[in-house]
Structures are given as C-alpha cells and as structure tokens.
Amino acid sequence: MKTAFVFPGQGSQKVGMLQDLYNAYPIVKKRFEEADEALGYSISKLCFEGPDTELVKTANTQPAILTASVACYEVLKENGFTPDIVGGHSLGEYSALVAAGVLNFKDAVYVVHKRGEYMQEAVPLGKGAMAAILALPREQVVEICQQVNDTVGSVQAVNFNCPGQIVIAGETAAVETAAEKMKEAGAKRAVMLPVSAPFHSRLMEPAAARLKEELDKIQVNDANIPVVANVTGKILTNASDIKDSLVTQAANPVLWEDCVAEMVNFGVTRFVEVGPGKVLTGFTKKINKEMELANVEDIPSLEKTLEFLKGVR
C-alpha cells in the first residue's frame, strides 16, 4: 500500500490558483515570497490577479505552476504526509525533484523560468505547434509522424499521456499534416493545442543545451524519495543521472503512461495530484482503473485529501 505524489505540468495554470491556501497557510505564503525573490518580479501577483495573457507565457507559467505545486506539497508535509515515490509531468518533474530533496526550491524556480525562456527562444512564434491525438494506437501515431517527417518536416510524438491520448509536436506545417493524416487513419480527434512552442520535440535541442548550462550552476542532490523520470519511465535516485535526464527531457518525449506503470510496479495503490488542476488524475484513471485518486489544489480538495490519507494510514 504505497502512495505516489504526482505534480502537474503546463496547462494546469489558472488566475486565482492557490489564493485560499496562501491566505490560510504561512508556509504557502513563504514559498510564494521566495519565488518572487528568486525571479525578481512578483509571480504571486501574476498567479492571483493575472492577467491570463501574461500567466500563459511559458517563462511565467513554469515558475507559477512549480511554486503552486511545491506550496501544496508543503501543506501536506506540514500535516504529516509524505510520499513513497514521486513523479511529475514535464515541468512537474521539477516540482517532484524539490519534494525529493534533489533541487533547492529557489534554484528550481529560477531554472524553470530560464527553461521557459529558452524553449520560447528555440523556435520563433508560429513556427512550431503541438496537437493532441485521441484514440489512435501508439504504433500508428509514431508511424504517421515518421512518414510526415520524411516528406514535410519535423514532427514526432512527444507526450504518451495515457491510452488514447498522445501529443505530437514539431514544425507547424508538419504537425498540421500529421494531424490530418491521423484523422484519416481513424483518430477520434486531432486537436491543435494553444501552446507557444513545440515542447519536447527535437526542435527544443538548442533549449536543452542552454538548460544544461543553468543546471551546471546549481546544487543537484541524490533523491531522498525515489523519482520516476519522464524520459525513461524508470526510477532514478542518483544526482548526476537526474541532471542528465532533465537535460534530455527538454527535447525528448514524456512517457507518462510508462511512469505511472512504473509506480504501480513499485507497489503504489494511491495517487495524489499535488498542484493546480486534475489533468494527471484523469490520465491515471485511464491508465489504471484500480488506483485510488486524490488531489490538492485548494482548501476543499486539501481537506478531502487529508481525510483520505488519514483513513489509509
């Protein structure tokens, strides 16, 4: 009977997130103040007041979600609950690494802000795109990407989220062509995503190289809680392996389905999504229907999850 804490990635942000927890818990306020200090501008104000047009910029979204997620984790910890294993989706992996003692919180806030900047600068606006492909088998998605790659331009599968949901990314024309072909091949839907860059695609390689320079400047520790890496779907605890996997992750697919399978294999029966939204809860439900699921993003969900965790002690 083990518990995993999992941390969300980009797309889960919303103006007003964490406001009630910020008002109720000094530790939440402290984390937001530390984030403001690390960034040199008020991410708190952006989270609570917006505007949304600024919050959705990846260089802001990334530190905002990381701060909100780590703050939720601190509240669980203050209440006496810690996980047996952690993982995070894309950006969420950094939140998981703070929880596992691998990264110092303020370092992580600064690094993900830079990660956002570098990802945005790697591909000019409008030149890259992402699309979610629903209900088409993994093999077919990969095969069509390969065909389009050989004829139109760079495109690849970049998020294996759960059965029936895979995200592709690359050059805009190639992504549009691949999405069209996937619909013809029987995909239930192929939806272009409102993102500003083709995250986790090969086009992010310049960002990965610059990210490595940032990671080289900060302290990276061995994990004190096992962490499941996005790029392999396997457990890592060694500092240098973790650092390498973060660099690789910027320009390679997120194997979320494999990450969840690894946690289940580790003995996990309960997943708690720590941070804004319930995206990962939805994925987990589709990957394994046997799991008990909870989340923490505000006071009502926190109270419910504390009851749930007390009940299974």
Regions found by a protein language model. Give the residues of each.
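Short, solvent-exposed amphipathic alpha-helical segments in soluble enzyme
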Residues: 22-23, 147-149, 183-185, 286-289, ...
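Alpha/beta catalytic cores of group-transfer enzymes, especially the acyltransferase/condensing modules
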Residues: 10-12, 39, 101-251
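FabD-like malonyl-/acyl-CoA
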Residues: 1-141, 270-300
